[in-house]
Amino acid sequence: MLPFFDLGFIKIPSYSLMLVLGVIAYVINLLVVLKKEGKEPPVINKALTVSLFAFAVMGITAFIFDSIFHSIEVGYLVFGGITWAGGVVGSFPAFVILTHYFIKEERGSEIEFFSLVVPGIVLGHAFGRIGCFLGGCCFGGVTESCLGVVFPTGSPAAQTYPNTITGEGSFPVLPTQLFEAGFELLLYLFMIIFRKKFKYNNAEIYLISYGIFRFILEFLRGDSRGATCFFISPSQFLSLILIITGVLIILFKKRLVFTSLYDKLSLWREQVKTGVYDAPQSVESKNAEIYKEIELLHGLYQKGILTEEEYQSKKAELLNKI
């Protein structure tokens, strides 16, 4: 534990420093990856703006979920603290929705676009967990193994598990913060090494793998994290949401669930390719745009994305608008 970096003339909170480094790591990763993907500067700038708002949503939902779980635990309303999993639950849909409305060049490919920036999120979170270790929060339960770490007197771990034998510091506890940081670094390396193969699948890979890891890690945690109305911990509850979301994305990409939305996204992707999203929206051009959509639907039918019955049905709906 090292709460502050003492430079003599100034003391820098280690947790805050790690958070800043995590954000910097995310931004650098975003700039490098999107440039490699050939994204134009306007798209990259919009991605940074979307990220800013998504981070704001992350902070809000992380705070709200943590407050809810601690309120359930004590039986009355309390505020304070954050939970990463709760932040992801809020920021992922926020990023996707904001991408749809503010980055029209990626319309129809919102999840794939999010996948491109996921490695930066993973790396940034690794820095954050190192900050947790230095700050003394998010610690594990008491252990007699060689992995145990003794936190100093006054630390959260020492307050929870005071060493009644020596009277100083905490009993040895598992450094679950470092376990999670190690997992994040390994996951980041995986995404970098196999970037070409999985770069558009990072969203579901992250949601499922992190959800499973965090669910298991919760059995080793020893700090207070609130409570749920179920038999699992708050983070295990949120982890299940992440896992289910990741599985749904896989099924969605195979067009096994939310087929209407899948067809809309496919149509939007075709529109982006042909530049239809920039088409005038005047009354005079409405019919021409409808015929253009019919052409795009026909293209989806020829590619096997739509069945003949689906194509004819959607075509009839569009023709009725003329």
Where are these regions (language model features)?
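Cys/His-rich metal-coordination motifs, chiefly Zn-binding "fingers/knuckles"
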Residues: 283-322
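Hydrophobic, membrane-interfacing alpha helices
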Residues: 1-286
